[in-house]
């Protein structure tokens, strides 16, 4: 809604309210939602969801300034301090999508130094886990060799 607010203020307000409603639904019914991509013979087996809720809470905090969203963002972030593929040997197709935790990045930029330090440390820990895996690899690559591993590379570089 922030992006559209200067162009379509009424619509931006409406989708901002819908974002809060969708978030509340996620709080009420926690968990991953499996996606079947059309007629493909597989589905996206996403296991994690707290990173999505963390990012949603951070963005809702930024748009509403309601402290309850900041507290929820921190709590969701603590449920998954490191993105699970980091340091792992393998993963299923899209198991830990979107492969990086933007919510950690957003909290790492918090004005609350304690929160900022905690989530920067979490990101550093994930990077260190990948580096430790890389030490065991003849190509110095700590990224699991899986379908879409290029996405993991991009996620690591982004983090």
For every predicted segment, state its role:
Residues 1-159:
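Glycan-recognition and catalytic cores of secretory/periplasmic carbohydrate-active enzymes
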């Amino acid at each position: 809604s922030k992006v559209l607010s200067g162009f379509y203020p009424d619509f931006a307000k409406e989708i901002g309210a819908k974002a809060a409603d969708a978030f509340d639904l996620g709080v009420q019914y926690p968990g991953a939602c499996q996606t079947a991509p059309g007629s493909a013979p597989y589905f996206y087996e996403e296991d994690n969801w707290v990173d999505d809720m963390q990012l949603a809470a951070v963005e809702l905090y930024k748009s509403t300034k309601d402290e309850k969203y900041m507290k929820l963002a921190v709590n969701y972030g603590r449920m998954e301090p490191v993105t699970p593929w980091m340091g792992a040997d393998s993963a299923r197709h899209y198991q830990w999508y979107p492969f990086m935790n933007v919510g950690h990045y957003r909290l790492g930029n918090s004005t609350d130094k304690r929160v900022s330090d905690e989530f920067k440390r979490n990101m550093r820990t994930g990077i260190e886990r990948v580096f430790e895996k890389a030490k065991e690899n003849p190509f110095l690559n700590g990224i699991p060799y899986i379908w879409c591993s290029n996405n993991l590379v991009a996620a690591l570089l982004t983090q």
